[in-house]
Design a protein with these regions (language model features):
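C-terminal regulatory/interaction regions
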Residues: 237-285
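Active-site HxH/HxHxD metal-binding segment of metal-dependent hydrolases
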Residues: 45-50, 57-139
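Divalent-metal (often Zn2+) His-rich catalytic cores of metallo-beta-lactamase-fold enzymes
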Residues: 88, 190-247
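Conserved beta-strand hairpin/beta-sheet module of binuclear metal-dependent hydrolase folds
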Residues: 2-59, 161-174
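Active-site neighborhood of phospho(di)ester-bond hydrolases with catalytic His/Asp-centered motifs
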Residues: 41-44, 66-74, 94-98, 151-154, ...
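Active-site environment of divalent metal-dependent phosphoester hydrolases
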Residues: 46-48, 74-79, 101-103, 157-159, ...
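Short, hinge-like loop/turn segments at secondary-structure boundaries
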Residues: 110-115, 189, 225-226
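Core dinuclear metal-dependent hydrolase active-site scaffold
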Residues: 32, 135-164, 169
Length: 285
């Protein structure tokens, strides 16, 4: 999907296993920045690498032109296709925050620490991180065009966003949750601070999230405000539940009860979702 003369969005379609032989359909976006060479922000999942490469060819570029891959965070739907990028363009460099680097370079470790049933359907393997990114770093992806690194933890400990001032383009990964979505983060307070930080970035014309089609204009602030309200709503739900449930209530039971309050009924909760609700309980302890 062409957004501007230099920015394209690519939607990856994949399935997430929520129980044995039970899947939900998911999507995630990568972003293609076109300059003298190609910069790819996030690589999607393992199974969609051929489609991403076909798209590059359709717009007149070669997968071998990818020279820079900033990674917003280390979750499977963002790193699963990295080995395919490396095979197509062996000289490509991969950039990530130090806190998420271990899960990119050791995917077996990520699977142990954050298990997903079909993890290895989504993730092909590890790649080496060429450079660790931190707040204020800049990456030049084309002549006269840069990406400035903004540390936006919460969704993961090493989540980053990237701002291209010359294009007014803010690439936020999963830093801003969708209104009504099941929460996926490790620290709700950090997520709130990160969204508030992004709201203050001057000159943003386009918001490029991992979960939603590109957003422009007044919708940007609305989307961020909706994300803040979603976290605050969940925090209040967990706070109220903690007043009535026994202290020894399991994370599974707490999550099921909280999801019911959100209008979502389930008998099984993914570990990443339990982590989200338990992070609220820890905050309110």
């Amino acid at each position: 999907m062409k957004i501007t003369e230099t920015i394209h969005a690519f939607k990856h379609l994949f399935r997430l296993a929520v129980a044995e032989n039970i899947y939900v359909d998911r999507t995630v976006y990568s972003y293609i920045l076109l300059g003298e060479k190609v910069c790819l922000i996030d690589a999607g999942v393992r199974g969609t690498a051929p489609q991403l490469q076909d798209y590059l060819r359709q717009i007149g570029r070669s997968p071998a032109e990818v020279f820079m891959v900033p990674i917003t965070h280390a979750h499977p739907d963002h790193i699963g296709g990295l080995p395919a990028v490396r095979k197509a363009s062996p000289a490509a460099s991969f950039y990530a925050h130090a806190a998420d680097k271990p899960w990119i370079e050791d995917v077996e470790r990520q699977y142990r620490e954050r298990p997903i049933l079909n993890f290895f359907e989504l993730v092909e393997g590890p790649v080496p991180v060429s450079k660790e990114l931190k707040e204020g770093d800049t990456l030049q992806w084309a002549k006269g065009k840069t990406l400035r690194v903004l540390e936006t933890p919460g969704h993961s400990r090493g989540s980053i966003s990237l701002f291209c001032e010359e294009e007014g383009a803010l690439f936020a990964g999963d830093a801003v949750p969708a209104a009504g979505a099941i929460p996926i983060y490790v620290d709700p307070q950090a997520s709130i601070r990160s969204i508030q930080k992004l709201k203050k970035v001057p000159g943003v014309k386009h918001l490029f999230s991992a979960w939603h089609e590109p957003i422009s204009g007044s919708q940007i602030q609305t989307t961020m405000d909706d994300g803040l309200r979603q976290i605050e709503k969940i925090d209040q739900i967990v706070k109220d539940l903690c007043k009535t449930l026994p202290p020894e209530t399991s994370g599974e039971e707490l999550s099921i009860r909280a999801l019911e309050k959100l209008g979502i009924k389930t008998g099984k909760v993914l570990q990443m979702v339990k982590t989200s609700f338990e992070s609220h309980r820890k905050k309110n302890a």
